[in-house]
Amino acid sequence: MAITAQMVKALREKTGVGMMDCKKALAECDGNEENAIKYLREKGLAKAAKKAGRATSEGLVGTYTHSNGKLVAMVELKCETDFVAKAEQFIQLSKDLAMQVAATSPVCVKPEDLPQEMLEKEKEIYKQQAIAEGKPENIAEKIVEGRVNKYYKEVCLLEQPFIKDDKKTIKDLLNDTIAVLGENMQIGRFARINLAEAVAEESEAE
């Protein structure tokens, strides 16, 4: 199938990847855009893995403030160089991450960061639920595993579906940007302040 400039342009707009890489991906996938996106994502994962050990001493703090001024989120996004920290796609990623934190209120960045006590508590709850449903213990264990993976998607930032495109996770979003900009990137600390939630907690405490 002939790869047209229009096809390449459309893929570039959807992925942010360079024109030559988009053309190559479309050629590899016989012009199928969906498969080309998957191809680019897999290439991005490989690039991200190669760059994972590099030091990330530059970056910026992305912020998001809700229109009512009562909800604010901040995310520390790290990269290798000041040059990339000033790149439009890196800045946009930091803003998207802050918006994600504001919308979903994650507990941690990745599953390994989740407090073990919290995880064990959730596992026990899921196990008791499965047993109460009449499941044998060996089946209950498999059910627990599935529910824990679902729990990760709720509380771990990297595992969450991206609020602007739920077909990709935040990990996908990060790896896509690494593939485009060619540097290792890491999400550091994040914070979320919601005035309405704070007022409600104070009222309950009185």
Swiss-Prot record:
Key words, A-Z: Cytoplasm, Elongation factor, Protein biosynthesis
GO cellular component: cytoplasm
Leader sequence residues: none
Main location: cytoplasm
TM helices/strands, residue ranges: none
Pfam families found in the cross-reference section: EF_TS (PF00889)
Region feature Involved in Mg(2+) ion dislocation from EF-Tu, mapped onto this chain: 81-84
Gene Ontology MF: a single term: translation elongation factor activity
Subcellular location: Cytoplasm
Taxonomy, superkingdom: Bacteria
Function as written in the Swiss-Prot or TrEMBL entry: Associates with the EF-Tu.GDP complex and induces the exchange of GDP to GTP. It remains bound to the aminoacyl-tRNA.EF-Tu.GTP complex up to the GTP hydrolysis stage on the ribosome.
Family, as annotated: Belongs to the EF-Ts family.
Name this polypeptide is given: Elongation factor Ts
Organism of this sequence: Maridesulfovibrio salexigens (strain ATCC 14822 / DSM 2638 / NCIMB 8403 / VKM B-1763) (Desulfovibrio salexigens)
